[in-house]
Each structure stands twice: as C-alpha cells, then as structure tokens.
C-alpha cells in the first residue's frame, strides 16, 4: 500500500511522544511537532501507527481548546536539520487525507519554523493553488524571527 523507505527502524509510541505533543505553555490547543529526531515511517504499520498517534494528539489539542470555548487547534512544526529527502510522500498524503476527514476546518494556524530552502521555494509555487483562507492559516518563519512572530501569529 505505501511502499518502503530506506530506514529499517520501527517508530515507537515513546519516540513519537517526544516529537509530537500538545504544548503545556499556551492555553490554546497547540500541537508541537519537532522533526529533530524524526524517523520516517517506512512500512504500513509505521504509517498507520504514526497517523493514529498524530490524530490522537490533535484530538487532545482540540479538547484543550474547547476548555476555552474554541473548537480549533494550532500546529508548530520545527524543521530544524530536516532534509527534504527524509519525506515519505505516501505517508504525507495518507496523513493529510486522514486529517482532512477527521478534522475538517479545525486548523486555526500552522507555523513552520526553519523550513529547508527547497521547502520555501516549493511552498511559493503550491500556495498559488491554495484558497485564500487556507493560505492565511500558514506561516513560514526562520529562527531569527521565531520569538517575535510566534506571539503575533498565534494570538491574532
């Protein structure tokens, strides 16, 4: 169904919980996704496990937001030292399809921090095909601007 990647490592729930979690630092339900030690899902079991884990974390973020009468969530993705070659496109497509079904119109903001330059250039092309409301939810920032823009973006 998904093919395989060159990695033979299995993704554990423990390793996922260190990379993907709900922030305790903000009141709004915010998912933190750090790719620092990311192991790309390499087989069907890993893809399903990672997708289920991410959906569970998003559910927790939504529940946290609902405590303050909101029904949306934010995502901060830290792409420090991430390489485009690490992407398993089948996983990304599967994850995106599942999340669109489970959480339609629930994303408030997505902030991508320190994306590789190829990602920035690709996003410049892709965003032309996105509708304006979706584009308004997306932000790409660098580490130099991180602290300044985080509050402005997330607290609008």
What residues fall within each predicted segment?
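SEC14/CRAL-TRIO lipid-binding/transfer domains and related phosphoinositide-recognition modules
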Residues: 1-105, 109-156
């Amino acid at each position: 169904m998904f093919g395989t990647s060159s990695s033979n490592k299995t993704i554990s729930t423990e390793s996922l919980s260190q990379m993907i979690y709900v922030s305790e630092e903000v009141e709004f339900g915010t998912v933190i996704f750090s790719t620092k030690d990311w192991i790309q899902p390499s087989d069907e079991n890993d893809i399903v496990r990672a997708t289920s884990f991410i959906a569970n974390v998003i559910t927790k973020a939504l529940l946290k937001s609902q405590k303050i009468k909101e029904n949306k969530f934010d995502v901060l993705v830290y792409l420090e030292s991430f390489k485009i070659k690490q992407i398993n496109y089948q996983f990304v497509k599967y994850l995106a399809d599942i999340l669109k079904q489970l959480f339609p119109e629930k994303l408030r903001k997505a902030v991508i921090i320190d994306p590789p330059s190829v990602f920035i250039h690709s996003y410049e092309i892709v965003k032309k095909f996105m509708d304006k409301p979706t584009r308004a939810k997306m932000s790409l920032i660098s580490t130099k601007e991180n602290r300044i823009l985080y509050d402005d973006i997330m607290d609008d």
